[in-house]
Amino acid sequence: MPELPEVETVRRGLADLLPGQAVVRATVFDSPKSFPNSPADVQQFLYGAHVTAVRRRAKVLMIDLDTRYSLVIHLKMTGQLIFRGANSFAGGHPNDSLIGELPDRSTRVQIDFTDGSRLFFNDQRKFGWMKLMPTDEIENLPFMQKVGPEPLDKKTEAGDFIKRIRRRQNSMIKPAFLDQSVIAGVGNIYADEALWAAKIHPQTRVRNVSDDQLEDLFNELRQILQLSIDQGGSTDKNYVDAEGRKGNYLSFAHVFRREGQPCHRHPDQEIVKMKVSGRGTHICPVCQVEIK
């Protein structure tokens, strides 16, 4: 599943191309699961609408329209947004095989614009979705009300993070860190990387982690997320950015997918892969000692 840096990379690519585009047609290939709106909604609020902005909240994308409606998209595991223009290609999280004829068998929604360009929402496993809804009602969606603060927002401070994660005192730190109500957009890759950077074992209980360590974890997370965005995200399996390029962050990774390789702090110690709450987890046993 794409995490915050990957979704933000997709957003930036589409934000360069979609604003100003006018919708002329929408074709739904998989309804109602992937696109639950009625034809009447599409006719009234999507046809003829101009794109005004492309936004992100946590791992969710929002394409705002001048009808005061928005297309809200969650890519989930294998969702893809692919923009095809006369002389341009953009998208996010597609397989290389999808850079070809579109629509294909994984296409769930196709949106056509007046200049002949098209936006495809593809999803092989059908976990993702696209929904047309009033812009001012997005914040009332259940998952939007539960999601925590944005880690890269200047208004978000370490104290906010500490207060929220302390609500899970008896939880192991990694699953608490992955809780989207604690901090938005963090997934397995960046949880592993930030915990290594802060020298915290992922199985340590939150109650045994000091406030200073939690502040360090928050600050390390911010630096790692920004580095990943600068590098176009992480190419884990099939992710590419809005220009069709693979993300480069994993070449900077310290632990994720580096099992059996030497730790960058302790070259004599290999990175180990383990399971924490059912999630594959990468650690350095020397850097990250579990506190019980």
Range-by-range predicted roles:
Residues 1-130, 268:
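Gly/Gly-Pro- and Ser/Thr-rich, intrinsically disordered tail segments characteristic of DNA damage-repair
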Residues 1-4, 151, 155, 210-218:
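Generic detection of long, well-ordered alpha-helical segments
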Residues 22-42, 55, 89, 160-292:
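Basic, nucleic-acid-binding surfaces and adjacent catalytic neighborhoods in DNA/RNA-processing proteins
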Residues 71-185, 190-197:
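Phosphate/anion-contacting hairpin/loop surfaces
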